[in-house]
């Protein structure tokens, strides 16, 4: 099969890296050849695949060596569970410089050093954050990734972030080949969560590709720095990640999204009871004023 490159975005703390690594482990278990490129200065995109605290990053090693050209591919690329290739781009010290530059530097280095080998089926870019800013848009801006998946939940801020990411991707979709493949709902057990995310997906013209239920086995596996696929392959949660993997393999619904306006998003949240129906008569009034 032709190489498929996928960027995974989502609100900070939504479980994006955990979801990505469990998805990748399921793909590897099914015989797919996969590489993960962590695009986050926290460098936590590969720890469950490698059973490590944090993989050494391209930017750290480049700083130690003098410059990125002084590195070899084997310095930055490690092999983890199921033969998954793992790389962390890293970034500068907090408060110094643009972390997005680390993503650009790392991807260019990997290309030049032949990391994107012919036997690869998938590359997943696990990308920082709530917004598609310049540096972190690198995987989609430069047409590296053709597919975007957004991890979200039924919480209001996760939905705002998902809509903003869809909005940020539209520009690059029109100028290149990147398309939105769907929303992955990583459940927080909010009311009517699956219905809400399906409604949000429909609103922006995509699909909820899978609903991942909440299960404590994920945390039990993480404590051991393992994916659920490896830690407890017979768990129901492992089957959920396998189902997500199959759906992504088979996915043909790749779209240019039509992001919701703030008013449309708030109407959706009010419809599902996430946000109270706005009463203009009380706007700006303190509690003591009623």
UniProtKB/Swiss-Prot annotation:
Spans traversing the lipid bilayer: none
Reaction(s) catalysed (UniProt annotation): N2 + 8 reduced [2Fe-2S]-[ferredoxin] + 16 ATP + 16 H2O = H2 + 8 oxidized [2Fe-2S]-[ferredoxin] + 2 NH4(+) + 16 ADP + 16 phosphate + 6 H(+)
Gene3D superfamilies: P-loop containing nucleotide triphosphate hydrolases
ADP-ribosylarginine carried by residues: 101
InterPro entries per record: NifH/chlL_CS, NifH/frxC, Nitrogenase_Fe_NifH, P-loop_NTPase
Residues involved in [4Fe-4S] cluster binding: 98, 133
BP-aspect Gene Ontology terms: nitrogen fixation
GO MF annotation, one: nitrogenase activity
Coiled-coil ranges per UniProt: none
Details of cofactor binding: Binds 1 [4Fe-4S] cluster per dimer.
Cofactor: [4Fe-4S] cluster
Note: This subunit is associated with the vanadium-iron nitrogenase component 2.
Family named by the database record: Belongs to the NifH/BchL/ChlL family.
HAMAP family, per the entry: NifH (MF_00533)
Listed name of the protein: Nitrogenase iron protein 2
Organism expressing this protein natively: Azotobacter vinelandii
